[in-house]
């Protein structure tokens, strides 16, 4: 923990490593819909966050910004898990985690932010990596659609990061996360009703993977990605 507090890049590396693990887990759940996987990931993550921050349950009231972020997070996961089912893990994992590229472009266009050489270099490497990977893609209709969904899920995540950065200035980490995940789960439940998907149809083994997704790629990763130290990388 001392290393992470002193080295924000080590913290960022661990967070990104944790979030990338969700892509291959989906391959172990081929019979389940993307919405079902996403719903249980968010629901269990919300319960974990509530359990960790139970002392402030009655004293903190979530605001509309957290609701907005939660809705976009719900769409992010629905799109991401569907993209993993349609394209390769490598393409989904890369294209589904380029949200920082969108946030930086937002800063350039709307906030007139001047980027450092390090950030510009990072953006260049991210775009180069995406181009290199896609140049080797099969470009089938299914794969292409999956890649489009992965990019859209990153755009949705960019909204979550931008809103979260503002909210986290005055709200505690788990006070924010528990309601963020709760609203995302509620959004996914509504999506499942629209799709006529039964999110309660799964095996005991499937539930074990849900717990993993909630604990590692979500609680460990997404909560750390909203830390102030990460915002200043």
Tell me the role of every PLM-derived stretch:
Residues 1-39, 68-71, 79, 140-166:
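Glycine-/small-residue-enriched transmembrane alpha-helix faces in small-molecule transporters
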Residues 7-17, 54-82, 145-153, 200-220:
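Loop-to-transmembrane-helix transition segments
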Residues 16, 45-49, 103-105, 109, ...:
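Transmembrane alpha-helical segments that form core, pore/gating elements
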Residues 25-31, 134-143, 194-209:
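Membrane-interface helix termini and inter-helical loops of multi-pass transporters
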Residues 36-38, 42-47, 81-114, 153:
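Specific alpha-helical transmembrane segments that line the substrate/conduction pathway
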Residues 49, 73, 115-135, 154, ...:
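Hydrophobic transmembrane alpha-helices of multi-pass small-molecule transport proteins
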Residues 60-66, 93-96, 109-132, 143-147, ...:
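Loop-to-transmembrane alpha-helix entry segments
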Residues 223-229:
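Conserved small/polar residues in nucleotide/adenosyl-binding loops
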């Amino acid at each position: 923990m001392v290393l992470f507090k002193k080295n924000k890049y080590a913290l960022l590396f661990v967070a990104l490593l944790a979030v990338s693990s969700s892509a291959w887990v989906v391959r172990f759940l081929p019979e389940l819909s993307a919405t079902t996987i996403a719903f249980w990931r968010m629901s269990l993550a919300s319960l974990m966050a509530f359990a960790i921050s139970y002392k402030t349950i009655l004293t903190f009231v979530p605001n509309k910004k957290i609701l907005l972020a939660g809705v976009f997070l719900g769409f992010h996961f629905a799109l991401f898990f569907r993209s993993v089912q349609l394209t390769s893990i490598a393409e989904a994992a890369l294209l589904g985690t380029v949200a920082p590229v969108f946030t930086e472009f937002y800063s350039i266009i709307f906030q007139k932010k001047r980027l450092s050489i390090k950030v510009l270099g990072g953006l260049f490497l991210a775009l180069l990596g995406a181009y290199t990977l896609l140049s080797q893609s099969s470009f089938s209709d299914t794969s292409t659609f999956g890649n489009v969904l992965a990019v859209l899920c990153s755009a949705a995540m960019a909204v979550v990061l931008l809103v979260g950065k503002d909210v986290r200035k005055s709200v505690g980490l788990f006070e924010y996360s528990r309601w963020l995940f709760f609203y995302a789960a509620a959004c996914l439940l509504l999506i499942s009703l629209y799709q006529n998907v039964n999110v309660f149809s799964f095996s005991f083994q499937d539930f074990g993977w849900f717990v993993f997704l909630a604990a590692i790629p979500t609680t460990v990763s997404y909560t750390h990605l909203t830390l102030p130290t990460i915002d200043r990388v």
